[in-house]
Design a protein with these regions (language model features):
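Context-gated lysine
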Residues: 8, 23-24, 41, 49-50, ...
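Long amphipathic alpha-helical segments with strong coiled-coil/leucine-zipper propensity
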Residues: 86-194
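A sequence-level detector of short, solvent-exposed, charge-rich linear segments
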Residues: 122, 129, 133, 190, ...
Length: 317
């Protein structure tokens, strides 16, 4: 099964390094009161100090996470990278190129302003100015630490593949776990505590559907979930919030997606979405008096005598 599965996948590896803007704390960085001393190294470590404003590095972290989310939308984590269906790779390559270009622009801007950024950080913390200045990295080192690139390749197992079979066969479980994580985040962020679901909240749900569809060959229990979601989506309103019975069906679908075991049970036909929907409350029975008030007399036809009939002559003397 491993070879057939790998033939349908490409591996995307994100290679992104970010300068931390931190250095290890040293004993000389502390001003100790008379008689005070630092704990020995085998008891506690000194940790690190920030030698640069973290806000100045925020764009690099943002772009790294954006690249990771992009790959997670269509693929699953695999051997330090992402296993992406071959027919979906064109969806992410242009975006990864864009992220790489933006990373390079942010890097150049940061390096151009490195001296000013570190000067401002020292000025903001004058009591630690000497400790920060001593720890500042040369700009050449910072330039080498800020890198973004990606590689896409096909994996070809060797004759002696070790535990590769187990890792490939485990990608289905990884898919269920990742979908459940994202479905739980969607529930907490956009659904919990509400009695309707907005059109905006449907977008991440549709992305989960597309991810499951693209990777359905990893586990035979995935396709029934895709079909159930398709059946639901075609009945949802195109505008406005989802309410009433469709809301309950959507909630039940999210509930299944948020649990790997429930997704497997659904795929095996052991769990139906309708089982998780609230049953409609029966209408209360009307009191007997109310029923009587609602009764109406049904008019009966009036029987009239046939006055036009002829009286026999023998009736008279």
């Amino acid at each position: 099964m491993s070879i057939q599965t790998l033939d349908k996948l490409l591996i995307c590896h994100i290679d992104c390094s970010i300068w931390s803007g931190r250095k290890k704390l040293r004993p000389e960085d502390f001003r100790l009161a008379n008689g005070s001393q630092l704990p020995p190294k085998d008891v506690a470590s000194l940790g690190s100090k920030k030698i640069c404003d973290p806000e100045a590095l925020a764009n690099f972290e943002r772009l790294k996470k954006e690249a990771q989310r992009l790959c997670e939308q269509v693929g699953v984590r695999f051997l330090g990278g992402y296993a992406v269906p071959e027919d979906r790779i064109d969806q992410i390559v242009p975006e990864l190129d864009r992220i790489g270009q933006e990373f390079a622009q942010c890097k150049q801007l940061f390096l151009d302003n490195y001296d000013q950024v570190t000067f401002n950080w020292v000025a903001k913390h004058p009591e630690f100015a000497d400790a920060i200045r001593r720890a500042l990295s040369p700009i050449e080192d910072v330039e080498q630490r800020l890198q973004f690139d990606y590689a896409i390749y096909r994996m070809q197992p060797a004759d002696q593949a070790g535990g590769l079979d187990d890792k490939v066969n485990g990608m289905g479980h990884t898919l269920f776990r990742e979908v459940a994580r994202d479905a739980n985040e969607l529930f907490e962020r956009s659904v919990a505590g509400k009695n309707q679901i907005s059109q905006r909240a449907l977008n991440p749900l549709k992305r989960l559907r597309d991810k499951l569809d693209g990777l359905s060959f990893l586990d035979h229990r995935v396709q029934p979930m895709v079909e159930a979601m398709d059946n639901l989506f075609v009945r949802l309103p195109k505008t406005g919030p989802v309410t009433d019975n469709l809301y309950h069906e959507l909630m039940a679908t999210i509930l299944i997606l948020s649990d790997p075991d429930k997704m497997r049970m659904h795929g095996e036909g052991q769990l139906d979405i309708r089982q998780l929907m609230p049953k409609p409350e029966p209408k209360p029975a009307q009191p007997v008096s109310a029923q009587a008030d609602n009764l109406r007399a049904i008019p009966q036809p009036t029987v009239r005598p046939n006055l036009g009939s002829t009286v026999p002559n023998s009736f008279y003397f």
